[in-house]
Regions:
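Rossmann-like dinucleotide/flavin-binding elements
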Residues: 2-102
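Short, aromatic/basic amphipathic alpha-helical patches
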Residues: 6, 104-116
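A conserved beta-strand/loop element that lines the FAD pocket in flavoprotein oxidoreductases
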Residues: 90-93, 113-119
Length: 119
């Protein structure tokens, strides 16, 4: 299904990964034993970019017209884990808008920005 969104270069670069693939990489039982590294060359990244809302809130037939309501929170979690373990890695998040629909979720997301320096 990701071929619908090839403008993000998922099929063209080993370093463009999904959130599920990142979860696997960050896992101690994963292919890199929990070490964050680029799949293309095994080196540590200097920058990580998360692109939100891909396939959600689409005006065309490639995706869904609604928000999944989970992406903002697990991106905040991933961003904080990366910044905590790798403080020299710059983390940037691109999004339509931030949606934090649960109790204290907005504080959690704000902490990623204010305490962890996620942009």
């Amino acid at each position: 299904k990701l071929d619908k969104y090839d403008e993000y270069a998922y099929s063209q670069s080993k370093d463009v990964i999904t959130s599920l693939e990142l979860e696997r990489i960050m896992n101690a039982a994963g292919p890199t034993k929990g070490h964050l590294e680029r799949l293309s060359d095994g080196k540590a990244p200097k920058e990580m970019v998360f692109i939100q809302c891909v396939g959600s809130r689409c005006a065309d037939d490639r995706g869904k017209s609604y928000c999944s309501k989970i992406c903002c929170m697990y991106t905040a979690k991933h961003a904080m884990l990366i910044r905590d373990k790798y403080p020299d890695v710059n983390v940037t998040v691109f999004y339509i808008d931030v949606r934090t629909p649960g109790k204290n979720f907005d504080e959690f997301y704000r902490r990623a920005v204010e305490q962890y320096g996620v942009r």
